[in-house]
């Protein structure tokens, strides 16, 4: 599971009485594990060296072992992009009065950037979309996947729901910058956000400084709290 989905699934399970099993890499943050368990979900950790692919494989195996189980398959679930097309993109369009010039979003499952980017480009083909990836694992730009600490983005595979044609460019962010900008969000803006949010904001600042976006609206998605 990625950084946010584990909490959401655990919350639904608690509210509806479902047994919820969350599989995540052992490298996920302590607070993520504690919070997910606090909602009553079971947490199974997979080796950090296997990345998110290892967690996906473990979840698939559990799905075959446990009768009546349902696999969310967030990296392959079309509901992800669909809900962002219907909600996130429409909210951005409405709140900017249709003046959004660029969208910056991290690429984890691919749901956010795919759904939001597709819909914004339908509304205005001139909107530019930027995907954010860890510099340490530049898979989106043809590089080698590798371990990194920016939980929530940069799985060590290309998710099936990620529309790689929707983004105009990919911005690679160093681990140290992601941490720094996450802290700056808290200290300077009062927004306590996660590391992937720090990476996204750092990328958005780079985009905003491009001459072509002077005086224009650049929207960044801050997904992790």
Positions of PLM-derived features:
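Glycine-rich phosphate/pyrophosphate-binding loop at beta-loop-alpha junctions
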Residues: 10-11, 16, 49-56, 78-172, ...
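Residue-level detector of anion-binding/catalytic polar loops
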Residues: 19, 42, 128, 191-192
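Conserved beta-loop-alpha segment that forms the PLP phosphate-binding cup at the N-terminus of a helix
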Residues: 6-16, 197-204
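Anion (oxyanion) recognition and catalysis
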Residues: 14, 37, 64, 121, ...
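Short, small-residue-biased leader/transition segments that mark boundaries at the very start
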Residues: 1-5
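Short glycine/threonine-rich catalytic loop with a Thr-x-Gly-x-Asp
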Residues: 72, 191-198
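A short glycine/serine-rich beta->alpha loop
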Residues: 101, 186-192
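A glycine-rich helix N-cap at a beta->alpha junction
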Residues: 18-58, 62
């Amino acid at each position: 599971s990625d950084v946010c989905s584990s909490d959401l699934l655990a919350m639904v399970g608690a509210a509806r009485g479902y047994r919820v099993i969350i599989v995540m890499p052992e490298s996920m943050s302590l607070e993520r594990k504690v919070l997910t368990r606090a909602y009553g979900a079971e947490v199974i950790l997979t080796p950090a060296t296997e990345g998110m692919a290892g967690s996906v494989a473990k979840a698939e195996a559990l799905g075959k072992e446990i009768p009546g189980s349902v696999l969310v398959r967030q990296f392959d679930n079309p509901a992800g992009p669909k809900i962002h097309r219907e909600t996130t993109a429409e909210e951005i369009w409405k709140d900017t009065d249709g003046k959004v010039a660029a969208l910056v979003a991290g690429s984890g499952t691919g749901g956010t950037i795919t759904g939001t980017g597709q819909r914004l480009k339908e509304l205005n083909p001139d909107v530019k979309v930027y995907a954010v990836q860890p510099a340490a694992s530049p898979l989106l730009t043809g590089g080698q996947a590798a371990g990194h600490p920016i939980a929530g983005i940069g799985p060590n595979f290309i998710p099936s729901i990620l529309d790689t044609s929707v983004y105009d460019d990919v911005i690679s962010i160093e681990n140290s910058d992601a941490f720094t900008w996450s802290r700056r969000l808290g200290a300077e803006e009062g927004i306590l956000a996660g590391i992937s949010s720090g990476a996204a904001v750092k990328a958005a600042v780079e985009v905003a400084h491009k001459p072509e976006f002077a005086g224009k609206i650049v929207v960044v998605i801050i997904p992790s709290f």
